[in-house]
Amino acid sequence: MSLNFFLRRYTVFPWSRKLGQYYHDAKRESSAWTESFHPFDEDLSKAALTFCITALLASLAYFLRQKEIVRLGCDLMNIFYVFDECADIADKEGASQIRDVVMDDLHRPEKTCPGGEILPGEMVKYVLLLCPEIPETYYNTKSFGFAPQSSSPQPHIVCATLSRISMPTQQQWFNVKRTIGPNVFLARSATVLPYAETHTFYHPRMIALREQAPFLDINSYPMKVRGLVQGSINWLEGYAAGVQAAFLDNIANLPSCAKEVESRVNIYVNELAQWARGNDDWTFESGRYFGDRGPENQSDIPTSSNR
């Protein structure tokens, strides 16, 4: 069944599409690494992983970073995919248990799990033990995105699982969106602007940028709620336009800082914006939301998506 709607292009954003030079190598290596765990019993799941091109998002978001960072981003995207596969077939309690094990592995990767390791946890341990230089701030309980948020008693993956079987309101969807996907990419950007620089990192405009970046994406919403009418999409576009205007205003009015900090601030802010730009391009290019018609639909024309 096909759902037709109209989306405006994401062309007024000052940041353009940029794909890192390490994309193909990082994608190949990360795919081989993921497949070495034999995570999928069915060819369909493996095909879906390839179809969604999870490595593409990491390469679009970190196009200026060294190969190791791009590869790490690809690995994490694949871990998220495997995590979702496990949670999709679990009930609420089971998804919570998976989350708890993975959280424990994040903070104590050297610990042996007495009850046996689950696959997402095993993959997380491998990454953290292989890359001990990853700052703790990168995978703290909030930034990594696996932990419950203070505003919601449920782990994000449980909320996301429940949203598949119920029709969330716009506010409910916004609450879930604050806790998922983007946080890991925004957290990776934080490594160039250490948390120790509290005055800069926690300035109100910098906080606002981090909160606004995930909401620059509206393209995934029609697929998630399975049935938005065009009027609602128009409302979302207006909402996103307001977020974008506020995002750009915050960048233009960031406070002055010491010269030695300014370069890191610029990198940090540009990575926040480039993630938003890359996520929009990935939405159309990956096949996740629009199948093989993504490039065709990335224009000011009526858009079709399989329901």
From Swiss-Prot:
Keywords: Magnesium, Metal-binding. Residues 296-307 have a biased composition (Polar residues). One of its GO terms (molecular function) is metal ion binding. Residues 287-307 are annotated as: Disordered. The keyword Magnesium applies. The keyword Metal-binding applies. Belongs to the terpene synthase family. This is Sesquiterpene synthase-like protein Agr10.
